[in-house]
């Protein structure tokens, strides 16, 4: 059974929302490029020039003999760079890029991006733009099945989202801990409820396709574990969580991201699990790609955050990424 603890609204009321990018068009119907700047931090970093850039645009035909035909909406995460350029200057340069898109496959369907345009202000992001990048197609594309293979494709940027990294120290994405399990431990998870503005894009289905204006996602923070062969009580874990002084914000890493900062005292074991960092980042691109795509241009805000305390999944429970059928002896077995 899970024990649930509600955080006070003051933990996210300052930076727990993201403004929408509302589509604007020219007289001929083409989308007008726009830029959105998000700052989920405290602003205590001395050097304020670090930023994360996330591009949104249209995957379209690149046939010079015919008008471009839009295939689907997509994104391109450029990552972190250091720049003093104005957002409008960066937007102008990204809209002039000639970004080629190619559909391929590995373990799953993927999209390959590479740029053919010389860089100026975007030089801090030259590695991903000039050497190319490969992404899981479902993470960066609304409908990869609409992208043809017999027609050259390009990625035309129409929106740019900039996330300023203004917190001091490092932003940690605790990937190594997300599947960590321990006997007699209590898993510390967070259940986040978002309110989504359904009027951002008229005619677009609501979250979950059920006419709802709210959506939830869950993240794993770490485990509370005793040295003795016993588990902590839920009340004791709640006390430890309260002492951490957690503050939450929404950012634009990978589309939409949850940022957590501990302003209080953290359990030594949990602090070690998180790499001795107190500023954490959870991109929805990795956690819930379907919800992340829904939020690409929408306005959203945190309306509730709950700490969910659950028994850590026993190590005897195997985690299956897939199911393999073995019929070597004429019998089907699930391995």
From Swiss-Prot:
Coiled coil: none annotated. It comes from the Viruses. One of its GO terms (cellular component) is viral envelope. GO terms for molecular function: structural constituent of virion. Pfam families: Matrix_Paramyxo_C (PF23765), Matrix_Paramyxo_N (PF00661). GO terms for biological process: virion assembly. Keywords: Viral envelope protein, Viral matrix protein, Virion. Its main location: virion. It is found in: Virion. Belongs to the morbillivirus/respirovirus/rubulavirus M protein family. The M protein has a crucial role in virus assembly and interacts with the RNP complex as well as with the viral membrane. This is Matrix protein. The lineage of its organism: Viruses, Riboviria, Orthornavirae, Negarnaviricota, Haploviricotina.
